[in-house]
Amino acid sequence: MLFKKNFLFLLFIASHFAGLTQKTNSDKLLTTFHSISSHEILEFAEELSADKYKGRLSGSPEYLEAARWCARKFEDWGVLPANNGSYFQNFPNAFTEVYSAGSFLYTTTDKKEIKYTFPEDYFPGSNSASGTVSGEMVYVGYGITAPELGYDDYENVNVEGKIVILESGTPYTKNDTTLVKWTPYAYHRYKFRNAVKHGAAGLLYVGKIANPNTVHLENFVYVHIDEKVAEQLFTDSGEKYSEVKKSLGEMKPVSFALNPNQIVTISAETRHFPDAESCNVVGLIEGYDPELKDEVIIIGGHLDGQGFLGEVFPSALDNASGVADILGAAKAFAQSEIKPKRSILFMLFGGEECGLYGSRYYVENPLFPIEKTVTMINLDMVGNGTGFFVSNGKSYPKLFEHFEKANEKFLHREMAASEQRKNYGRPRSDASLFENAGIPTFSLWTRNSVFPVYYHQPLDKTNVLTPEIMEDAAKLLYLGILGVANDSGL
């Protein structure tokens, strides 16, 4: 009888203290959860969007300084250097420094001069050669020469010494196996090289967005022009730009020379640095479980932006916002009393805007084996909206449920998800390279924009961010990733 009483007493004590431990862990979780602050996360975004970093063009001294600032934050919080004692993973990254907006002058058929203005009418080319070119214009559609596909935009036109006007993309747009054949011709680099191969002296690239994902070619000057400029140039030549562009979808080239009395003159003031390097910033929270700590969860987002093109492109939403959210989550994990069983790798990619340089380098030179990578979560433009969208969430329900439960219990935001869909075109995000490597990959986005989205524009400033959704994004990362990290059933 005495033994039975003692057993029951010990059972009561054990269950009582188990309850206290559970409550303590809950308190610890809430303490960390509430420590994540919209004010601090906005401060991170404001710092990275500051003029002193000149838009964080990958490879530039200003980008490297922004990377060092992020690394210092990791160090201050106790996030470990992930690359053999270093917070940096370096890779080659040529870049072009743009010193001014340059100029863009149009001389009409009746000799009237129209001086187009930056940033209303054009952006200078991020990789333009320095100098001035002047000449007649030839429209070459997509600028593609693909004999095996029976398609050539340069057939029956002479562009030698002239300024070509061309479009991004390809005439084939369906996401199926046929698109694979067209994908090599979708790259901006290909289009530029093909223009030079055909003798073009310069380029008007239709679509006024900043774009470092091009190529620097000696003596080749180019600008990005607004569609309204293209419309004016076509109208003065007796054509309607919108109708010509629409006809491109018929899979037939529509190239033609504009009136030879129409002359454009474009100039750029730049310097190219072919041997520059950039870096990913890599920080680590080590897992504590002896069997699971060799497995890793990656949280990534690109640190680089569009740089300086006559004025600073702050690149606040794209992607200081995503980096700020990641920093908020990293600080929370570093200071949390609840530790993860699996390791967590925080990655701030360089070179995304230049062509996914940093993420490609990591996938080819991983710090953790690919087969030990449980999931990769990418953040890009996560700072303007009232809800969340998780790409690929429905395809990995055992992983995604940790984020769903966190949102339902603590955040109560509208959150939607999609199935993973094979992309037959060129990869467009850091996440796509991890996905192609066979890693379960999510992309976290904000939805229901509160402010206009100034994609690759100088107006992409911190005044168009919604700090409340950024705070909740960091909280969602903390809770969801902690759930994945401590799920022994995965």
Which residues fall in each region the model found?
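Bacterial Sec-dependent N-terminal signal peptides
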Residues: 1-24
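Soluble metallo-hydrolase cores and metallopeptidase-like ectodomains found primarily
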Residues: 24-29, 109-110, 121-156, 219-315, ...
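Second-shell loop/turn segments in exported
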Residues: 27-35, 51-61, 126-128, 149-151, ...
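Extracytoplasmic/secreted proteins, especially bacterial periplasmic and envelope-associated proteins
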Residues: 28-31, 36, 40-43, 47, ...
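Catalytic-core environment of secreted peptidases
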Residues: 35-53, 58-81, 107, 156-158, ...
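Noncatalytic luminal/extracellular "stalk/propeptide" segments of secretory-pathway proteins
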Residues: 51-173
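Metal-dependent peptidase/peptidase-like ectodomains
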Residues: 115-116, 155, 222-225, 230-241, ...
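His/Asp/Glu-rich mid-to-C-terminal helical/loop segments that flank catalytic regions of hydrolases
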Residues: 331, 335, 451-490
